[in-house]
């Protein structure tokens, strides 16, 4: 655990970029409301800096960053900008209402990126960096500068440009391993050398931002801290471009559990890590792999008889941390068809949900209906039910009823009733199998050009009456949208998941139309 005598020099600032770098993961787009929910949770759990988005990219991103800034309580709210004047100004405008705002500007510094991507000389990159940091500092006190592809940059050049941007006013200097190329020992030496050679390095906080292309993002991040960095940039569940980013939960628990090797501390409330993982997974429709460290379903599961015997005698035989440390509670048979509202509300509060009266009533009704169809109600069932209810609250297309005729002979036929913007529509369709019939029915009811990229099914809990959780990814106009849904009936879950992804496409098209109209 964290040392008793805490000092600022040993504090590691946790910079979460789930809402920016994490959302750049293909198919992980979040709605405006989902971004606000994730940001509130990150703030509550003690994240120091929340990178809320990339304001210049769209009106939607600007509005999300601005609203998160307005609602912020304790965290610094950062926005990303390229090294362009318009980016800097737009970013500063987006975070200006935060209690503490930050402009985070980035430019490439490796020979390859400067030559191929930027088409700039090293001296031009220094000149641009200094000018943009100074421009940002004229508008805000907290400015972070990032050297994209930093670990493939030349050390002598990096020392010169870092010294220059600190002199221009950068308060944080971030050296990313943008393509996940470095290894721990190398990164420790790299950061240590850089900090020692930059004359004014004591005037800024040094930061690391590691990608997971070789599976070493967390190890490299910790190595960077050993080398002198005091800010770690990471995401919930490690989501991010390509192979992802360093996982926040793994960074934090590695420091806490192995404080003998990493004598540092942070402000994260670790009991909220599991909840944060589930909220982000629901918002992005990206399931967490079962064997994911810290927050995976099997992270604290023991099936081997030898392991079970050891854990029953003393949990420390096979557990290096207690499940309670990360907010994990074992599945329990608490709710059923005889449960009342009071017990249901208490269970939701215990699991960290805050629902409004209408959402609560809808969730309670669905729980009772599920209890009539399913013998045992587990925590995972409640989470799947409520997460789906919250995600569907803004949907324009809703499933009212579904009947499927399937068997060994004859075509498979689906009959579906949808509520489309308050109008009830009914249609029938055949298909090559029941799922195909269901999806063909949706296409008849809501004509669209989206292509099915992914269809996955897995059980939420065990048993023949377990809920099926279906993931569907649709692509449209070069964008991918993913949604998940759960139901004891796999076909119903399939229809809901498909409609969830379709609703995201409709919402995106609507937002783009509004943005275009506002710009004209």
UniProtKB/Swiss-Prot annotation:
GO terms for biological process: L-leucine biosynthetic process. Pathway: Amino-acid biosynthesis; L-leucine biosynthesis; L-leucine from 3-methyl-2-oxobutanoate: step 1/4. InterPro entries: 2-IPM_HCS-like, 2-isopropylmalate_synth_dimer, AIPM/Hcit_synth_CS, Aldolase_TIM, LeuA/HCS_post-cat, LeuA_allosteric_dom_sf, LeuA_bact_synth, PYR_CT. HAMAP family: LeuA_type1. The lineage of its organism: Bacteria, Pseudomonadati, Pseudomonadota, Alphaproteobacteria, Hyphomicrobiales. CDD domains: DRE_TIM_IPMS. NCBIfam families: leuA_bact (TIGR00973), PRK00915.1-3 (NF002086), PRK00915.1-4 (NF002087). Catalyzes the condensation of the acetyl group of acetyl-CoA with 3-methyl-2-oxobutanoate (2-ketoisovalerate) to form 3-carboxy-3-hydroxy-4-methylpentanoate (2-isopropylmalate). Its cofactor is Mn(2+). It is found in: Cytoplasm. Mn(2+) binds at residues 21, 209, 211, 245. It catalyses: 3-methyl-2-oxobutanoate + acetyl-CoA + H2O = (2S)-2-isopropylmalate + CoA + H(+). Belongs to the alpha-IPM synthase/homocitrate synthase family. LeuA type 1 subfamily. It holds the Pfam family HCS_D2. This is 2-isopropylmalate synthase. Its main location: cytoplasm. One of its GO terms (molecular function) is acetyl-CoA C-acetyltransferase activity. Residues 398-520 are annotated as: Regulatory domain. Gene3D superfamilies: 1.10.238.260, 3.30.160.270, Aldolase class I. Homodimer. It comes from Bradyrhizobium diazoefficiens (strain JCM 10833 / BCRC 13528 / IAM 13628 / NBRC 14792 / USDA 110). It is an enzyme of class 2 (transferase). Its EC number is 2.3.3.13. Residues 12-274 form the Pyruvate carboxyltransferase domain. Keywords: Amino-acid biosynthesis, Branched-chain amino acid biosynthesis, Cytoplasm, Leucine biosynthesis, Manganese, Metal-binding, Transferase.
